[in-house]
Amino acid sequence: MSGRALPGALALCLAGLLAPAPALAHHGSAVVGMAGPEGPGAALETTSPIPLPRGALFLMVKSEWVPYRQFDWADPENKTYSLFDTLVAGYGFAPWLSAYVFLPYNVKAQDGAGTNVGFGDPGVLVSLAFKYDEGFRLVPAKESLDELQDWHFSVFGLLTVPMGPTIAATPALEWYAPDMQTGFGSPSFQLGLSAAKQLDDDLTWLADASFQYFLPHTYPFTRYQFGFETRVNTALAWRVVATPGFRLDLAGEVNFLNLVPDREADGGGSLQPLPASGGTILYGGLGVRAYAGRFSAALAARTSFARWLNDQAAQQGSEGLEVARVALTLSWVLPQ
């Protein structure tokens, strides 16, 4: 497609549209995103494939509050809430190659066990961006507004490094269960693909799919492996206000999450699936994102509207049984 070249400042504002989200099981997820007054919109949980410009530095902080539904059968050990905070730094190494570092900090509260607070496992994510314009090709250094309406894609990979604590204990000096620890104890790997298409001047469609694999970890009290995760997300971002220095978007999303049951060592040391874990969940969410110059702020809420858990009556505090997931995100782009 042809059209006038995208101004440098606008290209920079579009930098943060890339949003490969490390879907950290039981530990929240981080999504980065910005946009300019013109061009494609960014979703809230769904990855966008638009990369960072070469030499651009991206900074983001996200805080996600997750209160859980309380059940009489889980008393006195109901999990009450989790707070997932994430600091993100990204850099554009090439017009088509971006990398991000994620540093999580988690708070997990449970009746009768107190609150466990600590850093999670940091992650490194690399994304390769390409587009379709009379054939597939890497994203060029400059794109016009017309060219930004082409199909855009990215392939991304994530590695988490086991640096978060895994041996925290309750005030009664009992070990927290693996899903109440703030770290995983072993590396995890995620691969994903994202796509975006600007449908008109104000409406952008986005989608992504990813798979995450967790290696087992030996704790002082057990050997445990978190279940594999498959995520498929889709979103519409609608630009409702656009001025030279300000933009306001509304976004609606549907998120699919499939969790393979966690596994724990039996008496003989073999890892066996845990019946009270895993399942399939559908989330729906709405949010608003505002942009002012190089800064962006977003507020979003989502909740599960359908769930098929493997043993729901014993899965209090798991995905799908949240009251809601409410996230606040602040981000900033520094030019080269």
Predicted regions and their residues:
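Outer-membrane beta-barrel channels and translocator barrels
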Residues: 54, 94-98, 106, 131-135, ...
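Surface-exposed strand-loop-strand hairpins of Gram-negative outer-membrane beta-barrel proteins
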Residues: 29-35, 53, 64-85, 171-180
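Outer-membrane pore/translocation modules
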Residues: 107-222, 336
